[in-house]
Every structure is written in C-alpha cells, then in structure tokens.
Design a protein with these regions (language model features):
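Ordered alpha/beta subdomains of enzyme catalytic regions
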Residues: 1-193
Length: 193
C-alpha cells in the first residue's frame, strides 16, 4: 500500500543464547509458513476491518487482493542456533510477514522443545495468579491491553489469556483490547496497536 515499490529484506534473529532449533523444528516452521501463505481474508473479516476507524478503506481494499508469498521466504538450518529466516521483496510484503513469522517460530519451538502441556498448565496457573492480583486490587492497571502475539506460547495460550483478562472486572483495572485483531473480533474487544 504505502512504499509499494520499495525493496527490502527482513531477517529473523534469535537473541536467546539457550535456544536451538532442530531440523525437525525448521521443517515444521516451513510447513506452518506455507500454511500462512494459503490464508486469505474473508469478506466478513474485511468488513470488520473496514469498520475500524483507524484503518483506511484503501488499505482494506488492498487486503482484499493481498496474499503472502512463500517464494519471498528463505528458511534454512544455516543460521545461528539452527534457524535462518529471511524474507525479501517489497517493503509492504516483508513488513507483513514479521509478526506471523515470530508467532509461528515461538509456537513451533515451545511445542517441540518442551512438554507443551506442562508449559500450558504453568502458563495458565501464572495467569490466574495475575488475574487474582487484578481482581483483589493488588494490581491497579487502569485501562490496559494485551500485546502477546509476537512472543506468545501458542494461539491457544493467547486466547486463554484474553478470555481470562476480559473476565477480570474491576474499577481500577479495565481490560480494553488486544493487538490480535482476529481475537479482538472474536471476543468483541477493541483492536489496539
């Protein structure tokens, strides 16, 4: 949409020195990126986006035509910690690949490197402790939002967090939305960010 002819490259860099990606993880990341590239917006989703005041109608029209291209990705085992991801193409395309790619990498890593069910159980326990702190007045957050997509444990964990935070009702801490537009739509929250 803006800067549509500007060519650029986006490179994934794992900054955690204790993380290593196996060949099986890299293959699963490839498969999930391929699945991402098959996604298309539905008319219902586009209509929802068109009703968000800070999203321009011309951008929604662009999204009607846009699709991610697997050909823009290079995913290999050559990088630091066993994973290299690079996208090349227009600035517009590469900028739209970053957040979904980070979410995919995190979810694949946590599902394949650990006992995912134990991680999810621990995540839920910690979240419920934080929810209790909100409801008991230990945390006074004012209006707050969730921005967990880039570094989330999983889609399942993020949705659980949104549901729990949305049900924590106090005058001092009001959950107003999420940066995950899909989950904002699904749970009738404000998309933010």
């Amino acid at each position: 949409h803006q800067f549509s002819d500007y060519k650029t490259t986006w490179t994934f860099k794992c900054r955690n020195e204790y993380v290593y990606f196996t060949e099986e993880m890299v293959e699963e990341i490839r498969e999930q990126i391929k699945n991402f590239c098959k996604l298309r917006f539905t008319e219902e989703e586009l209509e929802y986006l068109d009703n968000i005041k800070w999203i321009k109608g011309s951008y929604v029209d662009f999204l009607r035509l846009w699709q991610p291209r697997y050909e823009d990705f290079s995913i290999t085992t050559d990088g630091d910690r066993g994973l290299s991801i690079e996208t090349a193409g227009t600035w517009l395309n590469t900028s739209m690949y970053e957040i979904p790619t980070l979410a995919i990498v995190n979810e694949v890593y946590f599902r394949m490197a650990y006992d995912y069910e134990s991680l999810l159980k621990s995540f839920k326990e910690r979240l419920l402790e934080k929810k209790w702190m909100i409801e008991s007045g230990g945390y006074k957050l004012g209006n707050y939002s969730e921005f967990g997509l880039r570094r989330r444990l999983s889609a399942e964990a993020q949705e659980y967090a949104i549901e729990e935070l949305n049900s924590a009702k106090t005058k001092e801490s009001v959950f107003v939305g999420t940066s995950n537009v899909y989950l904002a739509k699904k749970h009738k929250l404000t998309p933010v960010g």
